């Protein structure tokens, strides 16, 4: 039997989340890792979400808490993390959840992580392009990647923050300056383009979208998003009108959601789904599963550009192989040239941000 003092201490710990922290910049009882019984966690990987209180971060945290490959889930943001952490932590799944609030706790959030996912930043609003977000999100990604370089340099890093065509090069430059850059471990998340392509193609063909796979190459904004409709699985053919319609809709999928939400947000739910799907693929690769192939925006030599989105095979070290683009038809070759021109500018913009 435990004595009265021990029982009181235990009840104090259990009730600590009911009191808000005295300051957002001070560690609250909820945020202390010592209050989590880590030894009871399921076997698996340690994952951190940076920007966990945002529109993408919250549903992404929910989905990662449900992933059986996750043993420890760290949620970091500059606001509202205690509430999100308390909410998510009540789910009876295996992952132990810990919350971290504000810049002083970034290092604790990152230490020992196997996978770091970055959805942090401001969302798109009507009339905004992804590049309009650059000046704000570029600085956020730089700060977070400096923390990663210091605290978990061997982690796999999934970059969601837009514009991905620039933020991935920013992350690479930060890691280079820190001496920790490993191109195999830095991946820009373009999975939402693939998810949309699968959905829209399935609608046109009258198929189940779960049975459709459309490679999407290039980048993650506008004309840099190039679906390879000639390589759809299962094999099928499209009219020129269908090709034009599908390509345009896939490229403008993000804008479609922003306009439909009429100022109330961007594609947060579908992005969280896509991000969790890609993160799961990375974790299965880390586990050693064979045949894990996803599209991602990575350091690449498949074109003359230093970064490019294409199919990659994932494994224990992150990217194990970057697959060739395969045969492209005339429409796709023309689209590729248009995409490369815009991509080159976006990549250089990211590099210049760090080296200015």
UniProtKB/Swiss-Prot annotation:
GO biological process, one term: malate metabolic process
First-listed, main subcellular location of the protein, grouped into a coarse class: other
Residues that coordinate or bind substrate: 124, 130, 162, 196
Organelle targeting peptide span: 1-36
E.C. no: 1.1.1.37
Subcellular location: Glyoxysome
Keyword Transit peptide listed: yes
GO molecular function terms noted in the UniProt entry: L-malate dehydrogenase (NAD+) activity
Annotated NAD(+) binding sites: 51-57, 77, 137, 160-162, 271
InterPro entries in alphabetical order: L-lactate/malate_DH, Lactate/malate_DH_C, Lactate/malate_DH_N, Lactate_DH/Glyco_Ohase_4_C, Malate_DH_AS, Malate_DH_type1, NAD(P)-bd_dom_sf
Homology family: Belongs to the LDH/MDH superfamily. MDH type 1 family.
The protein's name in its UniProt record: Malate dehydrogenase, glyoxysomal
Organism the protein comes from: Oryza sativa subsp. japonica (Rice)
């Amino acid at each position: 039997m435990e004595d009265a003092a021990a029982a009181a201490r235990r009840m104090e710990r259990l009730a600590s989340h009911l009191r808000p922290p005295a300051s957002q910049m001070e560690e609250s009882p909820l945020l202390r890792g010592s209050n989590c019984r880590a030894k009871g966690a399921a076997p698996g990987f340690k994952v951190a979400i940076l920007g966990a209180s945002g529109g993408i971060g919250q549903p992404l945290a929910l989905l990662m808490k449900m992933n059986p490959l996750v043993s420890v889930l760290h949620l970091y943001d500059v606001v509202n993390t205690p509430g999100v952490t308390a909410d998510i932590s009540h789910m009876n799944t295996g992952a132990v959840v810990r919350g971290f609030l504000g810049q002083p706790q970034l290092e604790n959030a990152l230490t020992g992580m196997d996978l770091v996912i970055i959805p942090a930043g401001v969302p798109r609003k009507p009339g905004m392009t992804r590049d309009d977000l650059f000046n704000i999100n570029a600085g956020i990604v730089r700060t977070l990647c400096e923390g990663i370089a210091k605290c978990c340099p061997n982690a796999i890093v999934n970059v969601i923050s837009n514009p991905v065509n620039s933020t991935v090069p920013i992350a690479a430059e930060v890691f280079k300056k820190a001496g920790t850059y490993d191109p195999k471990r830095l991946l820009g998340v373009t999975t939402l383009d693939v998810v949309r392509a699968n959905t829209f193609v399935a609608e046109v063909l009258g198929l189940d979208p779960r049975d459709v796979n459309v490679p999407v190459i290039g980048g993650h904004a506008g004309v840099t998003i190039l679906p390879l409709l000639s390589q759809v699985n299962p094999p099928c053919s499209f009219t020129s009108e269908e090709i034009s319609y599908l390509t345009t809709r896939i490229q403008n999928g993000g804008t479609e959601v922003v306009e439909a939400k009429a100022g109330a947000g961007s594609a947060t739910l579908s992005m969280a789904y896509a991000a969790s799907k890609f993160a799961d693929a990375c974790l299965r690769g880390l586990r050693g599963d064979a045949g894990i192939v996803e599209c991602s925006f990575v350091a690449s030599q498949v074109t003359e550009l230093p970064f490019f989105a294409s199919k990659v095979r994932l494994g224990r070290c992150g990217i194990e192989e970057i697959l060739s683009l395969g045969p492209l038809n005339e429409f796709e070759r023309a689209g590729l040239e248009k995409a490369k021109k815009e991509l080159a500018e976006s990549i250089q913009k990211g590099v210049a941000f760090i080296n200015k």
